[in-house]
Amino acid sequence: QFDETIKDNFFKLLPDFETRIQLKKGESLTLNYNMRNQFTDVTRLAQGLVLNNYNSLQYGAPDLQNALSNNISLRYSSFNLFNYTNVFVRAAYSNNIDQIRGLTNFENVIRTSTFFNSSFADENISLFGRVQRTFGKIRATINTSVNYSKINQFVQGEQSLNEGLTQTYTPEIRTNFKVAPNISLRYRYAVTDNNQGDRKTTFVTKSPSVDFDAYILQKFTFRTDYSYTTQDLGNGESQSFQNWNASLAYRKDADAKWEYEIRASNLLNIDAQVRNSANNISVFTSETFIQPRFITFRFIYSL
């Protein structure tokens, strides 16, 4: 930049360790630790002004150094052939050294930021678990995830600690028939807590959904899915939206080259989906506009 070439050559030993313990057939425990370099984007190093979008300006910091992260994880997996039970659990922890953080300022709706190597330690803890079992032609699954993050933010020249905790629980039941219709019932429950010092927010999301597919007369394939999502904003208000799609395909037989399909999207003609969330410097609402009810006819030829 400006007819000046910058090179940064360095030598650093980064440990990487993994061990696996086979507890018994189909059951294992794996421990992993590694230290990694984290390099930033070149736009954060540029000497000048970067326009991210209409209300966000960014100034580069050419003296930035790479950051380091310590990462440790423990995984447990088990599969039982006798009762068709599958269990998987993963716990992970990471912390950052000299993490690259932004110095953010707001003037009305205009956001300006520059960057520096922070001496404050940021941490992240995550836990994921899945238990799955098959009962004949029915498969039951429950997924659980918990994530905690601690981030030091710098807004309007002041340092503050941002803590976030997200919990998600998703039970599901699905059939697995070869000829008969199959149905999947799922329920997602999520709680997001965010503490930005003098401001605390809690979002509770509930989302039941159903998927259905059927193979009819060995010629027609019918598929449909429906979901309903509601989000509690924590202040007595809530928002909700739903979505429904369906399709019907025809193929004369399994060896036929041609397939004909009619597909309908957004059958309920929903205008938009509204979601609320929070990051390390703000709480925001995002609205995704959805294409109106849309029906297509498709012709598929298999070579």
What kind of region is each of these model predictions?
Residues Q1-L303:
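Exposed, low-structure sequence patches enriched in small/polar residues
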